């Protein structure tokens, strides 16, 4: 009996790696004088996959930096999508280029000079292109990008979004790949809305103003943020994803209404007074664009941003209010111009959509009157095309729809060209 069991053990085959015999595993694969079981194969596969992901992340980072477009190439790309704002585009092109070159220096980990991070503050009216510029940059660089509304943020422990949710949104954009998130861009809109109520420290708690600024300081400067995996809530027993925000580029933006008045007061206080004062110069009203271009950190402090917060945003650039001509160009010229978008939409119904020059000028004028900038253009066009977009899918034999100034000005019905050269107007209320 004992001899039989010895013979059986000798006839069994064993995994050369874990030592389990063929009866203890599902599969045992034989090689020249070596065996490997299915469990060891899975373990090896997991190790290789993990190493490959790590290597791919490093390679991906290096590739992004090695193939980084030059500043003039970045600006040229921005020109294709954003009309005007040439100075701001130049500032952003240089800032983004330097930021990602800095990462290359950081990854080399040499004993050379350590380069600081330069986050950006964009100041400009509604619809001037702040968000579009940031989105276009992120697409060009192929990095994760997220937009957060500063008005939804509160200090930790209060009702509202914790500031670390900003990083969680960025992680969601890249499927919780931490290395990719650490190369991303965070755009915080409406940053002017978290200004404290006065430039004097308040004894009452300002959880959605100065409190949020304080909470954002470390995040923007660079810290190790602990983020719950897969968007879960924080609790002490769980493991957190550690995200280093030192290499994340933060772009903050806002309209900063009334900031021009603060700048104007400062400039007026610096002018000569008394009999030698230049009365003519004093009477001249300076434009808002001119005043904002003279903005200094002290003006932003008076507005309600704390000095430490301004210090984390060393690059400040101003976007001009868009003129009527600029809005006309926005409607027609960029790659994703609104007119082109609606023409493509109508092409899906095999119908050509045409706007004459006068109608486009009137649409731009309406946006100027509404003080909505480029952001208001889409809602104006939607209103103009509502009836025809409602009727069109049910109509047949339509070849072309013509939009002229009367359609824009008095909301009259557009002209319809039928396939058999019949001309009718769209039905509508």
Curated annotation (Swiss-Prot):
Binding site for ATP: 125-132
Residue intervals of the ClpX-type ZB domain: 2-56
SMART domains registered for this protein in UniProt: AAA, ClpB_D2-small, zf-C4_ClpX
CC annotations in GO: HslUV protease complex
Keywords: ATP-binding, Chaperone, Metal-binding, Nucleotide-binding, Zinc
Binding site for Zn(2+): 15, 18, 37, 40
CDD domains per the UniProt record, alphabetical: RecA-like_ClpX
GO molecular function: ATP binding; ATP hydrolysis activity; ATP-dependent protein folding chaperone; protein dimerization activity; unfolded protein binding; zinc ion binding
BP terms from Gene Ontology: cell division; proteolysis involved in protein catabolic process
Metal-binding found in the keyword field: yes
PROSITE patterns: CLPX_ZB (PS51902)
Subunit structure: Component of the ClpX-ClpP complex. Forms a hexameric ring that, in the presence of ATP, binds to fourteen ClpP subunits assembled into a disk-like structure with a central cavity, resembling the structure of eukaryotic proteasomes.
Family indicated by similarity: Belongs to the ClpX chaperone family.
Biological role stated in the UniProt entry: ATP-dependent specificity component of the Clp protease. It directs the protease to specific substrates. Can perform chaperone functions in the absence of ClpP.
Protein name (Swiss-Prot/TrEMBL): ATP-dependent Clp protease ATP-binding subunit ClpX
Organism of provenance: Buchnera aphidicola subsp. Acyrthosiphon pisum (strain Tuc7)
């Amino acid at each position: 009996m004992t001899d039989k069991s010895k013979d059986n053990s000798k006839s069994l085959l064993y995994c050369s790696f874990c030592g389990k015999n063929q009866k203890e595993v599902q599969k045992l694969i034989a090689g020249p004088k070596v065996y490997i079981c299915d469990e060891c194969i899975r373990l090896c596969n997991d190790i290789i996959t993990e190493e490959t992901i790590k290597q791919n992340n490093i390679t991906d980072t290096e590739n992004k930096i090695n193939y980084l477009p030059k500043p003039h190439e970045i600006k040229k790309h921005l020109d294709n999508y954003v009309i005007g704002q040439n100075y701001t585009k130049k500032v952003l092109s240089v800032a983004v280029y330097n930021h990602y070159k800095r990462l290359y220096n950081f990854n080399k980990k040499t004993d050379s000079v350590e380069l600081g991070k330069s986050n950006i503050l964009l100041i400009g009216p509604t619809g001037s292109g702040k968000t579009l510029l940031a989105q276009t940059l992120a697409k060009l660089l192929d990095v994760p990008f997220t937009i957060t509304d500063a008005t939804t943020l509160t200090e930790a422990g209060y009702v509202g979004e914790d500031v670390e949710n900003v990083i969680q949104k960025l992680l969601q954009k890249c499927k919780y790949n931490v290395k990719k998130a650490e190369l991303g861009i965070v755009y915080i809109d409406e940053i002017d809305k978290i200004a404290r109520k006065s430039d004097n420290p308040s004894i009452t708690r300002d959880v959605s103003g100065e409190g949020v600024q304080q909470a954002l300081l470390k995040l923007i400067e660079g810290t190790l943020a602990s983020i719950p995996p897969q968007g879960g809530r924080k609790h002490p027993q769980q493991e957190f994803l550690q995200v280093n925000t030192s290499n994340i580029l933060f772009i903050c933006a806002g309209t900063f209404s009334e900031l021009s008045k603060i700048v104007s007061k400062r400039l007026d206080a610096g002018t000569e007074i008394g009999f030698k004062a230049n009365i003519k110069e004093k009477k001249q009203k300076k434009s808002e664009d001119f005043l904002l271009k003279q903005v200094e950190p002290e003006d932003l402090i008076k507005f309600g941003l704390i000095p430490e917060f301004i210090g984390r945003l060393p690059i400040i650039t101003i976007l001009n209010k868009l003129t009527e001509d600029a809005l006309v160009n926005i409607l027609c010229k960029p790659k994703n111009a609104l007119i082109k978008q609606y023409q493509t939409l109508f092409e899906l119904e095999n119908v050509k959509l045409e706007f004459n020059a006068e109608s486009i000028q009137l649409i731009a004028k309406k946006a100027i009157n509404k003080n909505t900038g480029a952001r208001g253009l889409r809602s104006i066009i939607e209103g103009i095309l509502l009836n025809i977009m409602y009727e069109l899918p049910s109509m047949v034999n339509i070849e072309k729809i013509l939009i002229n100034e009367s359609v824009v000005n008095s909301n009259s019905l557009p002209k319809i060209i039928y396939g058999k050269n019949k001309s009718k107007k769209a039905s509508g209320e």
